[in-house]
Amino acid sequence: MIISDELLRRKKMVILLFAVVLSFFTSMSKMLVPGPIYNNLQAELLFTPAVIAAVGSIYMYTYAASQLLIGIYSDRYGGVRILLIGGSLFTLGTLFFPFCSDPWLMGICRAVTGFGAGTVFLGEAKLINDLFSVKFGFVLGIALLIGYFGPVTGTVPLVGLISAIGWRKAYFIPGAICALAMSGILLMMRGTIKKTVPGQTFTPLFRMLKNRPMWLLCISAALIFGIYYVLLTQVGQKCIEDFYRLDKYLASLCVTLLSVIVALNNVVVNFLLKLAHGSRTLIFRCGTVLVLLGSLTGLSAFHFHLSVWVLIAAFLLLAFPAGFFSFYSIIAKELNPPEDTGLAVAVLNFSAFIFIALFGNISGVILGFWKAAAVNGIFPGEAYSALFVFLSVSALLSVILGLLVPETGKN
């Protein structure tokens, strides 16, 4: 079906709005497992820390895989087609997960959900690039701002909902809403599916693999996200409950602060660029230093038994640079040819989620060493101190690599 350019743009704008709704829940889904139900999985289903970490991190691995497997096709097949694939997978995985009790079935559902979530992001990014090419970074930041309020909803409000109706019913609701959003996309998609662009799909990827500055950026930024998401999705709420004996609502409120900061920072970046006179490296390097300071502050809080406010300060320091994904995307875009924008963002996101998954697994292994010392599922402070030693070393590596990322902006 051939439609006018004006109607095509209007339809794509409506589809983009539905994509933002999906991204709200894909962002929320990153921290749903284990997140608020860590203790439920531990006490109700008798999962070990390693199993809980595995069920949570499989989402991140498949999310990362989607960035390459689907990312290399995003510029050829168009945002709407990519969005349909991702939205369908994400919705199905989200709907079926609450009905599972076996760790293998849970893992399969989370794997499907993660792959779908990553594909939704690529479809959304491609749509934004098609509709707002000149203002790509700014509009992507706005979309991420809305999406990142998903984790905010997934903390205190969701904890209250779980207490009221149980975690299974509470976790079914996001899937039902996503099904409605997908229905809207299906109604609007006619005439918006672009014709496949011919060409060698893997050539841009091979070219990018040889781009040393791109990989310096990817690894340095990925370390930032790996550290942040260990707290957001794995142990942030639990370590506050365990070590400081705060109730689950106050603990989840602390994690909420992280989500709010990350959400807001996606649009603050443009203001920071003006202050830095367009310098990318100044902002990026300052971000890596904040992560190192945050990791060391968290280590001090557990090792020296400092106030919970010290740990919250550490969380805040870690959250600031984790909210700069739209900024990192600008650098990735500038380090590669314009026609490879979609793939550049995909490779950046792939790197981030590989490290998020790895850090999730490693956190489970580290806490597992103190399994025998855990009383009623509560880990000792030494376990969290060991975890923050690992995070601090990782943050130092991010700082070193960040110093090698070249400047791509203009003063």
Feature-to-residue mapping (PLM):
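Cytoplasmic helix-loop-helix junction between adjacent transmembrane helices
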Residues: 103, 109-147
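Helix-loop-helix hairpin linking two adjacent transmembrane segments in secondary transporters
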Residues: 139-190
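Extracytoplasmic
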Residues: 15-49, 65, 70, 231-237, ...
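Helix-to-loop junctions at the C-terminal end of transmembrane segments
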Residues: 66-78, 265-279
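Conserved MFS/SLC helix-loop-helix module at the cytosolic interface between two early adjacent transmembrane helices
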Residues: 65-104
